[in-house]
Amino acid sequence: MDLARVHTPRGWYDDFVNRLVNCARCPRLVSYRSTVKPLRRYESWSYWGRPVPPWGDLNARVMVVGLAPAAHGGNRTGRMFTGDASAQNLFKALFLLGLSNKPYSVSRDDGVEVRCVYITSAVKCAPPKNRPTAEEVYNCSSWLREELEAVRPRAVVALGELAWRAVLKILGATTAAFKHGEVVNAAGVRVYASYHPSPLNVNTGRLTVETLAEVLRRAAADAGCL
């Protein structure tokens, strides 16, 4: 895959989102995403319940790739890494580096702006128990491939093993074992591995905001963002 860097047109992004939100390739995900029962604290919300669009700086040099939208996060708010605990951990780290203007991400109208960073996921719909099937990951791979070709990042930070494997496969790299802090060069892109900023990983001490920020810092520095 040739990922020579060029300007990413706004027209591509708008067209991409319009196509993405109407995707119905995976019957299990279509059924689940639209029938998630709101948590009590979100009973007043009208859940998004569709494929969740990526967002960020369209001229980004760093692409952050997560697993999939959270049922009560992106699937509720309609924006990836927005409205759940994983999102808050990620944005605390981005804020520490000056890559986000706020240390949180709670809704599409929260005024958050990121610099040099584009945020997306390997799977675009919330999966039951946060576990997409191999077929669902494959079905979504064409979306992520299109994003990589359009945005042409210099660095990718893969949050979690599934995102790591999905990115490397699209870039045509020999799959390297997932290890936090690992770096692989593939198709002219430096791909960084990080544990996912989930509450489980943070609460057990496997990952901290600081160790996540360090991986992001290395990627951003290598990409020329810092």
Swiss-Prot record:
Which terms are listed as keywords in the entry? 4Fe-4S, DNA damage, DNA repair, Hydrolase, Iron, Iron-sulfur, Metal-binding
Question: GO molecular function of the protein, one example?
Answer: deaminated base DNA N-glycosylase activity
From what superkingdom does this record's organism come? Answer: Archaea
What does the record list as GO biological process?
base-excision repair; DNA repair
Q: Disulfide connectivity?
A: none
Enzyme Commission no: 3.2.2.-
Report the CDD domains cross-referenced here: UDG-F5_TTUDGB_like (cd10031)
Enumerate the SUPFAM superfamilies for this protein: Uracil-DNA glycosylase-like
Q: Name the InterPro entries for this protein.
A: UDG_Type-4/5 (IPR051536), UdgB-like (IPR044147), Uracil-DNA_glycosylase-like (IPR005122), Uracil-DNA_glycosylase-like_sf (IPR036895)
Residue ranges crossing the lipid bilayer per the database entry: none
Notes on temperature effects: Thermostable.
> Enzyme group, top EC level?
hydrolase
Q: Which residues bind [4Fe-4S] cluster?
A: 23, 26, 125, 140
Family named by the database record: Belongs to the uracil-DNA glycosylase (UDG) superfamily. Type 5 (UDGb) family.
Q: Briefly state the protein's biological role.
A: DNA glycosylase with broad substrate specificity. Can remove uracil from double-stranded DNA containing either a U/G or U/A base pair. Can also process hydroxymethyluracil (mispaired with guanine or adenine), hypoxanthine and fluorouracil. Exhibits a clear preference for double-stranded DNA substrates, but can also process uracil in single-stranded DNA, with lower efficiency.
Indicate what this protein is called per its UniProt record: Type-5 uracil-DNA glycosylase
Organism expressing this protein natively: Pyrobaculum aerophilum (strain ATCC 51768 / DSM 7523 / JCM 9630 / CIP 104966 / NBRC 100827 / IM2)
